[in-house]
Curated annotation (Swiss-Prot):
<dbReference type="GO" id="GO:0002227">
    <property type="term" value="P:innate immune response in mucosa"/>
</dbReference>
<dbReference type="GO" id="GO:0051673">
    <property type="term" value="P:disruption of plasma membrane integrity in another organism"/>
</dbReference>
<dbReference type="Pfam" id="PF00879">
    <property type="entry name" value="Defensin_propep"/>
</dbReference>
<dbReference type="InterPro" id="IPR006081">
    <property type="entry name" value="Alpha-defensin_C"/>
</dbReference>
<dbReference type="GO" id="GO:0019731">
    <property type="term" value="P:antibacterial humoral response"/>
</dbReference>
<comment type="function">
    <text>Probably contributes to the antimicrobial barrier function of the small intestine.</text>
</comment>
<protein>
    <recommendedName>
        <fullName>Defensin 5</fullName>
    </recommendedName>
</protein>
<keyword id="KW-1015">Disulfide bond</keyword>
<feature type="disulfide bond">
    <location>
        <begin position="64"/>
        <end position="92"/>
    </location>
</feature>
<feature type="disulfide bond">
    <location>
        <begin position="66"/>
        <end position="81"/>
    </location>
</feature>
<dbReference type="GO" id="GO:0050829">
    <property type="term" value="P:defense response to Gram-negative bacterium"/>
</dbReference>
<feature type="propeptide">
    <location>
        <begin position="20"/>
        <end position="58"/>
    </location>
</feature>
<feature type="disulfide bond">
    <location>
        <begin position="71"/>
        <end position="91"/>
    </location>
</feature>
<dbReference type="InterPro" id="IPR016327">
    <property type="entry name" value="Alpha-defensin"/>
</dbReference>
<keyword id="KW-0211">Defensin</keyword>
<dbReference type="GO" id="GO:0050830">
    <property type="term" value="P:defense response to Gram-positive bacterium"/>
</dbReference>
<keyword id="KW-0964">Secreted</keyword>
Length: 93
């Protein structure tokens, strides 16, 4: 079951890379983001067959946020946010 979760995350990552390539930014024109606006907690669910107890154990301490450009240190890309408020990347830690 752990392999299924990992495989699902990798598939979502591959789809995201194909769907929206990240634009290259120049270091001089890079603007600082406002942390309060983009930090939105998102609930995550795993669909499909499997033991609900296992799914609860996997998601128990998982905290996810919709980010605009990239995940913060310690977070990983887990998919694409369904809300389209300028934050398409789903980052979880």
């Amino acid at each position: 079951m752990k392999k299924l979760v990992l495989l699902s995350a990798l598939v979502l990552l591959a789809l995201q890379v194909e769907a929206e390539p990240t634009p290259k930014t120049d270091e001089g024109t890079k603007t600082d983001e406002q942390p309060g606006k983009e930090d939105q907690v998102v609930s995550v669910s795993i669909e499909g067959q499997g033991d609900p107890a296992f799914q609860d154990a996997v998601l128990r301490d998982l905290k996810c946020f919709c980010r605009r450009k990239s995940c913060n240190w310690g977070e990983g890309i887990m998919g694409i946010c369904k809300k389209r408020y300028g934050s398409p990347i789903l980052c979880c830690r």
